[in-house]
Structure formats: structure tokens, C-alpha cells
Regions:
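Catalytic-core regions of glycoside hydrolase
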Residues: 1-105, 110, 149-156, 160, ...
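Charged, amphipathic alpha-helical linkers/stalks
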Residues: 95-138
Length: 167
């Protein structure tokens, strides 16, 4: 399936097919369904930010309504790729109502200190790029479509601001 968009996203009607199949399986199995979750960080390219918690945040409430028993997530410890989204995935599995944006607002100043503002801009731009992408594939050749040169230059400027704050 398309790992970049939630199954409620009207731009991608085939995601409704996936949701229909999931509903069918939970009915047939009387709710005894566990999802093998191939975390998106396994895709695109190692050490390229590739967040996926936004998709899970949009889908997890439906998983809870369907009575999904749990998840088995396959991922890796490539922190530039997985950074916060594995933490948020774990939190969302336990609490589908988690307010990720509120958590992020607390995270940036706690983790980055005086560099919080440029790092919030940096990560927000990355999250927005994945939210807004029309890319449905998930291999290395999509990198320029998600991270065009202009965006990479903007990301670089926020990293330089972060570096300046820490000097």
C-alpha cells in the first residue's frame, strides 16, 4: 500500500480499499487482528528523514474503533531516518488520542534548547513535505520529488541558524 498517505485521504481512493479489507478482516476474525507494520523508515534511503507518524496518527483512531489488538513494527535504528516518529508511533499505539503537535511544542525547547526555533522550522518543513507529497512510491528515486533543491536549501539555512546559536 501507499505508506505516505492515510487511508482517510480522499486524494488516494485506493486507500479506501485497504480500509475496506481491514474492516473485513476484523469482522471475519472477530477483532482478533494484529498488524505487521513495516515502518516507513525502511524505505526511501537510509539516513534521509522519512517520518511516518503523521499517517499513523490519522489511521490509529480507526484501528482502535476496529478493535485491532496490536502492532508488530519492523524498523531500524537509523536515527536520522526514524528520529521522533518511532517514539510517536509507540505513544500512539498506547494512546490513539495523543496530541502529537502538543508533544512537539514541548519537545523542541526541551531537546534543542536555544536552537529550538530553527529546528522546529526544519522538522516542520520535513513533516509538511511528507504530508503534502503526491508521491505514493517509496524508493530512493522519489527523493527529489519530496526534497526538491529549494527545500534542501531552506533546510540548510535552518541548520546553519542552529549552528550559529550553538557557537
Amino acid at each position: 500500500t501507499d505508506p505516505n498517505h492515510a487511508f482517510g485521504d480522499s486524494r488516494w481512493p485506493w486507500k479506501a480499499d485497504y480500509l475496506g479489507a481491514l474492516r473485513g478482516w476484523t469482522r471475519a476474525m472477530q477483532g482478533r487482528v494484529v498488524i505487521y507494520d513495516y515502518d516507513q523508515s525502511m524505505l526511501v534511503w537510509r539516513d534521509l528523514p522519512n517520518p511516518s507518524h503523521q499517517v499513523l496518527q490519522a489511521e490509529i483512531k480507526e484501528h482502535a474503533r476496529l478493535g485491532i489488538l496490536g502492532f508488530g513494527t519492523e524498523s531500524r535504528n537509523a536515527l536520522a531516518t526514524t528520529f521522533l516518529h518511532l517514539y510517536f508511533r509507540g505513544q500512539l499505539y498506547w494512546n490513539p488520542q495523543l496530541d502529537v503537535q502538543a508533544e512537539l511544542k514541548q519537545f523542541y525547547p526541551r531537546f534543542f534548547g536555544p536552537a529550538a526555533a530553527p529546528m522546529e522550522a526544519y522538522w516542520s518543513a520535513i513533516y509538511r513535505a511528507w504530508d503534502e507529497t503526491i508521491v505514493t512510491e517509496h524508493e530512493f528515486f522519489v527523493i527529489p520529488a519530496i526534497y526538491p533543491r529549494e527545500m534542501v536549501e531552506r533546510l540548510g539555512s535552518w541548520l546553519r541558524q542552529t549552528d550559529a546559536v550553538q557557537q
